[in-house]
Regions:
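N-proximal low-complexity "stem/linker" segments adjacent to membrane-targeting elements
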Residues: 1-20
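Short His-Asn-centered micro-motif
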Residues: 7-12, 35-38, 81
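A generic local structural motif
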Residues: 19-22, 87-88
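Short, acidic, metal-binding catalytic loop of nucleotide-sugar glycosyltransferases
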Residues: 22-32
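Alpha-helix termination/capping residues and helix-transition junctions
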Residues: 27, 92-93
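Active-site-proximal specificity loops/subdomain of glycosyltransferases
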Residues: 38-92
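Short beta-strand-to-loop acidic/aromatic patch adjacent to the donor-nucleotide binding site
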Residues: 95-100
């Protein structure tokens, strides 16, 4: 069976529907989920892992992957980097066949 990891990168207060999202993750037990954020999250399903870091730490991580200046001033601009998530999060997705 293939190993799959879904990345979720979100900074700030989590949306009100977040517990429902976690519940759906639980029922997709053949997929792992990685959440990178700055919140305290408890009671995670076994297939959900959290990497807690500040937005500034994430900016430093992103910049460390590129040899040119990166502009990431606000969390909502993280979506601009989705095509590079595999590179940015490479240390977290080692051993997976697919990531998204």
């Amino acid at each position: 069976m293939y190993k799959i990891c879904i990345l979720g990168i979100y900074f700030g207060n989590l949306p009100s529907y977040f517990p429902l999202w976690l519940e759906s993750c639980k029922y997709n037990s053949t997929v792992d989920f990685l959440i990178i954020n700055d919140q305290n999250i408890t009671d995670l399903p076994v297939n959900v892992r959290q990497v807690k870091m500040s937005f500034n730490d994430f900016r430093v991580l992103v910049q460390s992957k590129f040899d040119f200046p990166v502009s990431l001033e606000r969390p909502y601009k993280i979506c601009d980097f989705k095509p590079a998530f595999g590179l940015i999060c490479s240390e977290y997705i080692q051993g997976y066949d697919f990531w998204g």
